[in-house]
Amino acid sequence: MKRKKIVVALGHKALGTTLPEQKAAVKRSAKVIADLVAAGADVVITHSNAPQVGMIHMAMNEFGKMHTDYSAAPMSVCSAMSEGYIGYDLQNAIRAELLRRGIFKTTSTILTQVEVDPYDDAFNNPVKLIGRTLTKEEADAEEEKGNYVTKTEDGYRRIVAAPKPQDIVEIDSIRLLLDAGQVVIAAGGGGIPVLPQNEELKGASAVIEKDLTSGLMAEMLNADMLMILTSVENVSTSRISSPERTITSPVIGWITS
């Protein structure tokens, strides 16, 4: 029987915000992943990084203030750092859960770059929330540095561009590991946004919506299923439709962005 190929997208609620929360959250997420593996599925996991990448960016900027020999870390570098440490916790949690069930299967994390279009309108209209809630004073300081900030119910948040993913650079590596029977963690936080420039890939000052990258990955891998684990109560039709309609039963069809 052909094994089902499933792309699982973990939202930020499945990862927590602080390091202790993340340690506990990935153990819960690992049980879900292990259930799929035990049922005979080949699994690729993507995950959010919205709180983490913003906090890394802020921490690196503050470190740069204290140590002037160090420059501020670009957003693309912060995305790479978040992929690494979230992948580390998630990979070990999945490995341990599989071993507890007597399943001997390698889990690997792939540092993943995702190409974006430099002319994407998102670069002129940043909307993606990152990092923790800021005070008014902190928000003013961020704006003085040229960063975008928006007011929320709880205070203020940094916002950055969120261009659409165009291509997944490491898709062949992901496919090879999946075909070899490994559990693969890839495109954390939507992947590291990069712009192709001749032979090189340059990091973009942006983050990518992980659900869009997950959809692209499912398409490129010819996956049987895309599973998005989220904390929202239910799925609704587009917010711009009139009226918005809540979906309460399974629907087979296309999801467009």
Task: Describe each region flagged by the PLM.
Residues 22-27, 59-70, 124-132, 199-206:
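A glycine- and small-aliphatic-rich helix-loop capping segment at beta-alpha/alpha-beta transitions
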Residues 55-68, 242-252:
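Short, flexible, mixed-charge acidic loops at enzyme active sites
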Residues 7-9, 42-55, 106-111, 184-187, ...:
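Short beta-strand segments at enzyme active-site cores
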Residues 224-229, 233-242:
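Conserved phosphate-donor
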Residues 14-16, 50-54, 116-119, 192-194, ...:
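Short, active-site-adjacent cap segments at secondary-structure transitions
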Residues 63-184:
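Ligand-binding beta-strand-loop-alpha-helix segment within the catalytic cores
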Residues 1-49, 55-65, 176-181:
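N-terminal glycine-/serine-/threonine-rich phosphate-binding loop
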Residues 24-32, 74-92, 97-100, 161-178, ...:
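Polyanion-binding loop/helix "lid" in catalytic or ligand-binding cores
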